[in-house]
Amino acid sequence: MLPDKTALPIITLSQPTAEVGAQVHRLISKCPPLDPNSMYCNLLQSSHFSETAVAAKIGDELVGFVSGYRIPQRPDTLFVWQVAVGEKARGQGLATRMLKAILARPVNQDINRIETTITPNNKASWALFEGLAKKLDTQIGSAVMFDKTRHFADQHETEMLVKVGPFKAVQA
């Protein structure tokens, strides 16, 4: 019997460690329109914020990464900093799977809201969070958070604050 060439590769999800920080940096650089951060920032995301981040791998290759943190004044809210999915893993629902994996961790069972920022033209991110809101059976709303002129001195597109929730705890 011939191997099935249409079979999708197995993608494993795990809580990241500092060892993937450099891979995260490379992955994000290949995922426009994401803003690159310093490698140091990616190391901190992978270590200090590992409970609210996830790494997706095919074998040893990092193909997806979500970074986030609990908003200090509202610890029931996960702020999603970045969602990166490499070309090899696109079209498989990996971004939603990664977000749900973070929410399903025992340490995150009290999170019942998500916030993120999205530029108006980032159709993939809008579709991701609109779809996630549907899957979580909750509402989604948005408003300007950082204005192109007022906050970014015309150096960056306006960032819309997107709010998803409230929702019930996500089970693994």
From Swiss-Prot:
Keyword field contains Acyltransferase: yes
Residue ranges occupied by any N-acetyltransferase domain in the UniProt entry: 11-165
The organism's place on the tree of life at top rank: Bacteria
Pathway field: Amine and polyamine biosynthesis; ectoine biosynthesis; L-ectoine from L-aspartate 4-semialdehyde: step 2/3
TM regions (residue ranges): none
A Pfam family that the UniProt record links to this protein: Acetyltransf_1
Keyword rRNA processing on entry: no
Temperature-related behavior of activity: Optimum temperature is 20 degrees Celsius.
Example of a GO biological process term: ectoine biosynthetic process
Broad enzyme group: transferase
Regulation: Inhibited by zinc and cadmium.
Key words of the record: Acyltransferase, Transferase
UniProt family annotation: Belongs to the acetyltransferase family. EctA subfamily.
Known role: Catalyzes the acetylation of L-2,4-diaminobutyrate (DABA) to gamma-N-acetyl-alpha,gamma-diaminobutyric acid (ADABA) with acetyl coenzyme A.
Subunit structure, as described in the record: Homodimer.
Name assigned to this protein: L-2,4-diaminobutyric acid acetyltransferase
Species annotation: Methylotuvimicrobium alcaliphilum (strain DSM 19304 / NCIMB 14124 / VKM B-2133 / 20Z) (Methylomicrobium alcaliphilum)
